[in-house]
């Protein structure tokens, strides 16, 4: 869905990506987006309890074919390993179709309906986490609706939230500012956008991009 979920609609100026995103090969492996972040990025990670929560879809994806592990999950696992975090995979109770086009259609309808799909399980003792990394692919120019379900499910007051996403050409598509607005009582730091194809096929580049980004955040 990242292509349909990531295409630029020339008539509406809305990024319409279908389900994990589209872009030409680029020398830029990752980009830190700072517009939605505060001027100081000091998460004070020493001794902090950290969670990496992410939505990611395997099966048929744009630009990478049928995959066993979603692009965003790959990045999430690198982050969790680097910072010593717990992980939570945001999964819907009703699975998305395995086929790319079919999944795109479902995702587009959910977005039109402003749906909040029910998600499986939950984070135990969410209140214990000081820092939450929040990851997702770009679907139709936005976060998957299940990510909104996740944000609605917990109190993020006084937590540090650090977004990251995968895409195939649309970057972060304004989602970091959206998170800042959606979670006004959280401190949202600089995010990282990385191409899904890079995450799938260039592991060393992806790991280095994650390390560089985390270094810049003070981890």
What do the PLM-derived regions correspond to, one by one?
Residues 69, 73, 77, 144, ...:
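Short, surface-exposed alpha-helical segments at coil->helix boundaries
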Residues 51-53, 88, 133, 162-164, ...:
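Hydrophobic/aromatic beta-strand patches that form the interior of the parallel beta-sheet core
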Residues 81-86, 117-120, 162-168, 192-197:
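Short C-terminal domain-edge/linker segments immediately following a structured domain
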């Amino acid at each position: 869905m990242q292509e349909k979920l990531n295409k630029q609609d020339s008539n509406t100026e809305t990024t319409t990506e279908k389900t994990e995103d589209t872009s030409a090969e680029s020398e830029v492996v990752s980009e830190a987006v700072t517009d939605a972040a505060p001027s100081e990025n000091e998460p004070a990670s020493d001794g902090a309890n950290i969670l990496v929560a992410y939505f990611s879809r395997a099966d048929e994806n744009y630009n990478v074919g049928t995959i066993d592990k979603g692009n965003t999950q790959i990045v999430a696992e690198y982050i969790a390993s680097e910072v010593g975090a717990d992980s939570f995979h945001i999964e819907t109770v009703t699975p998305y179709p395995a086929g790319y086009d079919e999944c795109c259609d479902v995702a587009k309808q959910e977005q039109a309906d402003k749906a909040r799909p029910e998600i499986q399980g939950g984070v135990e003792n969410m209140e214990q986490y000081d820092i939450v990394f929040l990851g997702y692919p770009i679907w139709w120019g936005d976060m998957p609706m299940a990510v909104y379900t996740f944000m609605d499910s917990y109190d993020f007051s006084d937590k540090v939230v650090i977004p990251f996403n995968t895409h195939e050409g649309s970057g972060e598509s304004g989602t970091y500012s959206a998170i800042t607005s959606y979670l006004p009582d959280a401190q949202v730091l600089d995010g990282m956008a990385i191409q899904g194809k890079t995450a799938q096929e260039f592991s060393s580049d992806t790991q280095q991009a994650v390390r560089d980004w985390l270094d810049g955040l003070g981890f």
